[in-house]
Amino acid sequence: MLAGGSDGRVAVPLWLDPLSLTAPTDARALRTTDEAVRGIAAIMATRFRLPVPDRVMVHVYDGRRAFEQGLMRDARVSPVQASKLSNFAIGVGARGQVLLNDRPADRTQRERLRLIAHELTHVSQIELAGGEGRGEQWLAEGMAEWVAFATLERLGLDTLERRRQTAMAGLRSHATLLQHLDLEAHGTPQGFAAWHLREGSLPVYQLAFLIADDLIERRGLDAMRAYFASFKRSSGRRGNFDAAFGLSLDDFEAAALARLKTAAAL
């Protein structure tokens, strides 16, 4: 992807002029990190109308230890949190920057592009909300997965429907996740982190994707953008959810849980 620095870190500033970005349709045009970030940003801006900052700093780290150090140095994450994150995360999207762990080196192109799209979606959410850590964390993660999969679909590498089927199959193997969603508790970064550390990252992220997919199907991506943008005006999580989606978080949770149980035949 990029040549490594002596400290296992490469930092690349990218200027993203929305007017000059061209959305690719062929993944072969996205071989380098620079090409991938620019191409995916173009897809997000033109296809999903998601804002991307004019300048994004991309940090690529050669392994977990360098990634942990980068989280502290470049993202200003506390040492304790950086240690926890580096144990399971392979990427982080922060305000105006994307941090990527470049290991394992044999990561497939599809997974590399998914990761970049996921983290760039977090950068966009932060742009919309005017800051980090705003909005429901399960929804931020689920939306990031949805945009990433839709981006792969645009590039001919995957489909949303296949990801839905894969996620639903995963839920059937982790039926305890559908006993009680408790979205309020999983709405904070700390609550979401505890959830996926307890239940496993893959099934929890699959569930978050399915919940976000359900919400996007019923209310649309415009409502999702409006939800995150509402945090520039108000920090009220429940009120912002009600206003953007036209129903309370409790009512949505009950309806979504019933639909998921039916779809999973549980």
Predicted regions and their residues:
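Compositionally biased, low-complexity repeat tracts
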Residues: G4, N87-V92, W138, L183, ...
